Amino acid sequence: MKIEEVKSTTKTQRIASHSHVKGLGLDEAGNAKQSASGLVGQESAREACGIITELIRSKKMAGRAILLAGPPGTGKTALALAMAQELGNKVPFCPMVGSEVYSSEIKKTEVLMENFRRAIGLRIKETKEVYEGEVTELTPCETENPMGGYGKTISHVIIGLKTAKGTKQLKLDPSIYESLQKERVEVGDVIYIEANSGAVKRQGRCDTFATEFDLEAEEYVPLPKGDVHEKKEIIQDVTLHDLDVANARPQGGQDILSMMGQLMKPKKTEITDKLRGEINKVVNKYIDQGVAELVPGVLFIDEVHMLDIECFTYLHRALESSIAPIVVFASNRGNCLIRGTEDISSPHGIPLDLLDRVMIIRTMLYTPQEMKQIIKIRAQTEGLNISEEALSHLGEIGTKTTLRYAVQLLTPASLLARVQGREVVEKEHVEEINELFYDAKSSAKILQDQHTKFMK
């Protein structure tokens, strides 16, 4: 007899470099705790980010820019992700890297604008009238065919719906009868009909029929409790980019050209300013009517020094437009040349006139104690057992080299411990792995010492 174990098919979450970040780790007063929500240290930067998230929530921050500046490995990307976690999934957060704007198919400014629109949400409130209940009767009424002949057409459908509160008889359009047939609605089914669109949805068989033995595997649902006729408010969250794309590429035409267009590989096309202007008009009309509200989100541009002078000039205009999100830049450069210029150098690789418009948040280097805490959190996230000695040693390595290098030694050290049959990662495992691999500084030193042996 063969017995097989059924393995779970749920997707295992891969541990990324910022999986441990769960939020900014602030208390009720907005002060940073020393270590909370996966973040350690950087108290002043975290408090500043906390104030910005509050401003975003109260919608007073749109069209402003923030720059996270600091040396590599001081948690700039982690802070931006923590802000996204704090804001929740209702506020759009669009991360991008500075080098993403360079494409052979579309302009740099188009990529920037696309991401700008992705970071602006629109919350549309819609009131739907719904008839819901168990079908008690379903009678199509026929009339003579106006075209002549012996055939008859359906003029209307009489349907009876029952809920726990009462019953109602409805006279429906013949087009709804087709929907009822498609859904295979019978007496005893629980359905709901949208009054505005005439959409019909069969939810299942009423559970009063559950005792009847039937060969078909039916899904039994309870009798609806409210009234037959109800008004439901449905809230939809879309971004402006979704609206742009939906209108830029209309789906389904019957002519041969659109058929061919659907078969061919879709080329990335630019969305024109005219189309965006039209969509903005419609959005403004919705906002004036109170049907929708604008939710300015966050656009996070990492490695902002990779943008060139043209992109920066475009950012000026984009930041000052009426519909603009909050832009968070991150850069680990000091004074460097602005890309696309010959000899203009500037702090963080950003032109001075744009630096004038941004609020700068500094991130400081971590102390050995903070590094130790971060490595401990990473070990917990990756599910590794590590001794105190090994943690302290990794903290020292992180201080001499970089935090990233110290964190990268964790998994190989745990693998070595497992090969040796140990459950806990000890100091000697870390030392052995550290001897096998080089960090950037020691590798550069070897290059300097042996520069004659390497090719130029």
Curated annotation (Swiss-Prot):
GO terms for molecular function: ATP binding; ATP hydrolysis activity; DNA helicase activity. Has single-stranded DNA-stimulated ATPase and ATP-dependent DNA helicase (3' to 5') activity suggesting a role in nuclear processes such as recombination and transcription. Proposed core component of the chromatin remodeling Ino80 complex which exhibits DNA- and nucleosome-activated ATPase activity and catalyzes ATP-dependent nucleosome sliding. May act as a negative regulator of embryonic heart growth. GO terms for biological process: axonemal dynein complex assembly; box C/D snoRNP assembly; chromatin remodeling; DNA recombination; DNA repair; epithelial cilium movement involved in extracellular fluid movement; heart development; positive regulation of DNA-templated transcription. It comes from Danio rerio (Zebrafish). One of its GO terms (cellular component) is MLL1 complex. Keywords: ATP-binding, Cytoplasm, DNA damage, DNA recombination, DNA repair, Helicase, Hydrolase, Nucleotide-binding, Nucleus, Transcription, Transcription regulation. Forms homohexameric rings. Can form a dodecamer with ruvbl2 made of two stacked hexameric rings. Is a component of the RNA polymerase II holoenzyme complex. Component of the chromatin-remodeling Ino80 complex. Component of some MLL1/MLL complex. Residues 1-20 are annotated as: Disordered. It catalyses: ATP + H2O = ADP + phosphate + H(+). Its EC number is 3.6.4.12. The lineage of its organism: Eukaryota, Metazoa, Chordata, Craniata, Vertebrata. It is found in: Nucleus; Dynein axonemal particle. This is RuvB-like 1. Belongs to the RuvB family. It comes from the Eukaryota. Signal peptide: none annotated.
